[in-house]
């Protein structure tokens, strides 16, 4: 199982220390998601995180940060749906249906499938997937190691997925 954490959409005091501690405890990948914030704040945060962890950070905004800070890659979403011209490197994206996962996952290093559970960070953002739909997508090999669950994934949910062997 790969542990990926997505940041809160806003910055907070000592966020760099918490991110560093997560990496020290085994975090695989951090997705830096700070929509509608000036790039300079992301730059400042990245300068406070040890360089050795930058190769494990994916940015959702301000794609130039990938090169400037030697980050792992970029993440495409509704706000930023296309990679920069002549971009080479890791790309992930967000998907919101089984059909979208099926059609897009082959073009990316991995995709987020969301929301698997009702969101705890977005108001009125509810899961539309049934357990049977997820099982069928797994049987059809639509859900595989390139598909990451997103949306209120908690320790309890992680244990359930680990037991079932999906997402």
Where are these regions (language model features)?
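Helix C-cap/helix->beta junction micro-motif
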Residues: 52-53, 87, 143-144
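Glycine/Thr-rich beta-alpha phosphate-binding loop at enzyme active sites
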Residues: 69, 78, 90-139, 145
């Amino acid at each position: 199982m790969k542990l990926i954490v997505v940041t809160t959409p806003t910055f907070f005091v000592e966020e760099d220390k918490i991110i560093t501690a997560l990496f020290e405890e085994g975090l695989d990948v951090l997705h830096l998601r700070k929509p509608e914030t000036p790039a300079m704040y992301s730059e400042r945060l990245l300068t406070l995180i040890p360089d050795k962890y930058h190769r494990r950070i994916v940015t959702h905004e301000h794609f130039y940060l990938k090169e400037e800070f030697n980050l792992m890659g970029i993440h495409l979403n509704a706000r930023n749906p296309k990679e920069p011209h002549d971009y080479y490197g890791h790309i992930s994206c967000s998907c919101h249906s089984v059909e979208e996962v099926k059609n897009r996952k082959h073009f990316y290093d991995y995709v987020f499938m969301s929301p698997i559970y009702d969101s705890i960070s977005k108001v009125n953002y509810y899961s539309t997937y049934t357990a049977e739909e997820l099982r069928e997508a797994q049987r059809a090999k639509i859900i595989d190691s390139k598909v990451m669950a997103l949306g209120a994934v908690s320790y309890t949910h992680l244990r359930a997925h680990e037991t079932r062997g999906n997402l």
